Regions:
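N-terminal intrinsically disordered/low-complexity leader segments
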Residues: 1-19, 209-210
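Generic hydrophobic, amphipathic alpha-helix propensity
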Residues: 16-28, 45, 70-74, 78, ...
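Helix-turn-helix
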Residues: 23, 27-65, 69
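Solvent-exposed, amphipathic alpha-helical segments
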Residues: 23, 27-34, 81-85, 115, ...
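Hydrophobic alpha-helical connector segments
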Residues: 69, 80-112, 163-170
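Amphipathic alpha-helical packing segments from all-alpha helical-bundle domains
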Residues: 76, 80, 84, 108-114, ...
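Amphipathic alpha-helical segments used for helix-helix packing
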Residues: 94-95, 108-131, 179-182
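Hydrophobic/aromatic-rich alpha-helical bundle segments in the mid-to-C-terminal region
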Residues: 130-134, 151-210
């Protein structure tokens, strides 16, 4: 007896659009990581995803808009890991250790660092992109500051500086150390990066050595 093929479910217009958008984002992420933001054209992205240039512009106003969406998703993925630490019913000591480990390992876990660097360079040169990117970065700092404030309340450790300033400082330190590690991996090795970030974090946030 011949088995009848299961009819393929037809996607709605919204589902088809979402699928196209996801394919374009996946293709762009892959190309940006290999060719860089500047080196990958809209045509390259559309071709890699299996769509037309028109399909690209039906989903994104520009390559820069797509870049911000990729960075937003990267940040949201990081937040999921951070949120998991806060939702665990752990003691103060365990929570402090987990947060410090999370921060000190951020550079090793951030596979899209060079895209963040390219976005910052683009923001420095392109006023229109700068407005959009800086609004996103402001939101990112505010969310991190909220986590810092919540962490301080949860473990009962008073903050030495305002949460927004600490968020800015911790982000700047992490980015700077990762930049050095990317440029000179022979000397700024993962253990060195982890030690630097961990010790600075412990001293600034906890007021003690790691």
């Amino acid at each position: 007896m011949t088995r009848q093929a299961t009819p393929r479910t037809r996607l709605t217009r919204e589902q088809s659009r979402d699928q196209t958008r996801e394919c374009l984002l996946d293709a762009a992420r892959s190309l940006f990581m290999t060719k860089g933001f500047v080196g990958a054209s809209v045509e390259d992205i559309a071709q890699e995803a299996g769509y037309t240039r028109g399909a690209f512009y039906s989903n994104f106003d520009s390559k820069a808009e797509l870049l911000v969406e990729l960075l937003r998703r990267d940040h949201e993925a990081m937040e999921v890991d951070l949120r998991a630490i806060f939702e665990a019913n752990a003691s103060r000591e365990v929570m402090e250790a987990r947060v410090m480990t999370f921060y000190s390992r951020l550079p090793q876990d951030n596979k899209m660092f060079l895209l963040w660097v390219e976005a910052k360079l683009l923001a420095a040169r392109d006023a229109r992109f700068r407005t959009r990117f800086n609004a996103f970065m402001k939101e990112k700092r505010e969310r991190l500051a909220a986590y810092i404030e919540e962490f301080s309340a949860r473990v009962g450790t008073p903050l030495p500086i305002a949460p927004d300033l600490m968020a800015l400082g911790l982000m700047g330190l992490c980015d700077g150390v990762q930049f050095l590690a990317t440029a000179d991996p022979q000397h700024v090795t993962p253990p060195v990066v982890e030690a630097v970030l961990g010790r600075f974090f412990a001293r600034v946030v906890y007021g003690r050595d790691a």
